[in-house]
Amino acid sequence: MAELFNFEMTATDGKARTGVIHTPRGEIRTPAFMPVGTAATVKAMMPESVRATGADILLGNTYHLMLRPTAERIDRLGGLHKFMNWDRPILTDSGGFQVMSLAGLRKLTEKGVTFKSHIDGSRHELTPERSMEIQRLLGSDIVMCFDECPALPADRDRIAESMRLSMRWAERSREAFGDRPGHALFGIQQGGLEQDFREESAEALTKIGFDGYAVGGLAVGEGQEAMFGCLDYAPDMLPVDKPRYLMGVGKPDDIVGAVSRGIDMMDCVLPSRSGRTGQAFTRHGVVNIKNARHQDDPRPLDENCSCPACSNYSRAYLHHVFRSNEMISGMLLTWHNLHYFQDIMAGMRESIAAGTFEAWQKTFHETRAQGDIEPL
């Protein structure tokens, strides 16, 4: 019998890979971009709208859901999939990053992290064991092990200490996760921008054994050049037959650069957050729909995009509803952005399978460099 969760690589082109992650809830085509459903919703989107963009999988946030409405309540109500009406796979993060970035009065120990909720100031403790329990209650298809992600820049001693703590937590996460057929546990490589620490982390994780591996600790302020420098070697240290997930990366240029370096999965709030603030991603770069140049423009955001915003509405209309603070503005621009990101992923999958990924990248970068269409 086939495994309930497995990764099938179907083609490579250079370091870039395309394939399918098989799960009981459906297939995830890779490279895959995961929209972020922070509080059991992708902001400004209905679940069926997210499905229509081409998304195979969503990301949920353990930290936010454990605080409100709580994992126990979601479990009583039938699990996260039923709660938010999403019938495809869900990956949940471990909560570690949000604890470090959002929570107040944190105390880090070998056991875990105690912190105050950013919502009401209540005290909580998050450990590898508790993180695994929360993600089990949520019913996540892909569970992330609990880790610490230090902000960059940081000195080598701090990075080493943090990475080794995360590796001990990874072992505890693996033990607490147990044997759950159909559910996957991913380990998270840490080590900052230090190649030797990345190698040490990868060796520790591989020895423990996971269903997939994430490259963590990037997109935390180091800049694209430094991130790409790390990605030139970090994914190569991870098992070739398992999915590789780059956490929290979502600018189009970053996504394409990551895939060219062997990454299979990514997530980011950028397309939805930008949509709500009047920014649309197009083949020609970012369009700020709030700008007055769009107020009399009858053309779509992108004439080659088939999303509802581009198929049915003009730039002038999108400008108007944004300036009028109408809810439909965030809905249409978020839908467009998520559709565009999924178009990028589909283009990469097709070109990798055809062996034309280098040419696809060239066209992608040249088109973006042209900038937005001239105003009327």
UniProtKB/Swiss-Prot annotation:
Instruction: Provide the species name.
Output: Ruegeria sp. (strain TM1040) (Silicibacter sp.)
Q: How does it assemble?
A: Homodimer. Within each dimer, one monomer is responsible for RNA recognition and catalysis, while the other monomer binds to the replacement base PreQ1.
Amino-acid positions noted as binding Zn(2+) in the UniProt annotation, renumbered to this chain: 305, 307, 310, 336
Which function does this protein serve? Catalyzes the base-exchange of a guanine (G) residue with the queuine precursor 7-aminomethyl-7-deazaguanine (PreQ1) at position 34 (anticodon wobble position) in tRNAs with GU(N) anticodons (tRNA-Asp, -Asn, -His and -Tyr). Catalysis occurs through a double-displacement mechanism. The nucleophile active site attacks the C1' of nucleotide 34 to detach the guanine base from the RNA, forming a covalent enzyme-RNA intermediate. The proton acceptor active site deprotonates the incoming PreQ1, allowing a nucleophilic attack on the C1' of the ribose to form the product.
What name is this protein filed under?
Queuine tRNA-ribosyltransferase
Instruction: Specify where the region named RNA binding lies, as residue ranges.
Output: 248-254
Q: Which UniProt keywords apply?
A: Glycosyltransferase, Metal-binding, Queuosine biosynthesis, Transferase, tRNA processing, Zinc
- Write down the InterPro entries for this protein, in alphabetical order: ArchSynthase1/Queuine_TRR (IPR050076), TGT (IPR004803), TGT-like_sf (IPR036511), tRNA_ribo_trans-like (IPR002616)
Q: Which reaction does it catalyse?
A: 7-aminomethyl-7-carbaguanine + guanosine(34) in tRNA = 7-aminomethyl-7-carbaguanosine(34) in tRNA + guanine
The terms under GO molecular function for this entry are: metal ion binding; tRNA-guanosine(34) queuine transglycosylase activity
**Listed GO cellular component terms?**
cytosol
